[in-house]
């Protein structure tokens, strides 16, 4: 799925997502001290704007220019204080983020393809500064049964799940949350996602 695919998908609707921040982010990041955040697969910017509104300096990254333009427009509407805290960046994960640059790396419901050498994933892990937080939220695979019935080519094993990432973390990390739990927000329209899988880990060094 390339930039053209996602641009077309965003153009197919006036708004693809709700514009609200994801529940996992709100629950897990509300108590963190604001700093520098990387929002991976930011879409139309709901999470980025929530973070910026709480004092974070946010780098919001997505492959879709259409999504980024919508996010930037929403930031402008939210006011200069919020808009000035977000940098909207078009990139895919072949572009490695700068190491140690972020106090929070957040990846919410982003389909990150699993790789034998974990190159893209390790780039994201390296982007977390010592003392910073990695936060990943995903749909529970048990809720995907109906989707798999309609899309038999879909292979969930082709993508990292939060628990997969937890197993790859070394002793330079402290895992604080690694669990499956009920969603705190309504699932996307037309889906049956009722549980989230969540990983929150703190980089020690």
Stretches with model-predicted labels:
Residues 118-130:
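A short glycine-rich, Lys/Arg-flanked "PGG" loop and its adjoining helix->strand segment in the class I
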Residues 96-104:
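A short acidic, Gly/Pro-enriched loop at the edge of an enzyme's catalytic core
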Residues 1-32, 35-43, 142:
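Conserved class I S-adenosyl-L-methionine
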Residues 131-139:
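Conserved beta-strand signature within the Rossmann-like core of class I S-adenosyl-L-methionine
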Residues 103-117:
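A short SAM/SAH-binding and catalytic strip from SAM-dependent methyltransferases
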Residues 44-94:
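Class I SAM-dependent methyltransferase SAM/SAH-binding core
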Residues 156-172, 177-178:
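Short alpha-helix
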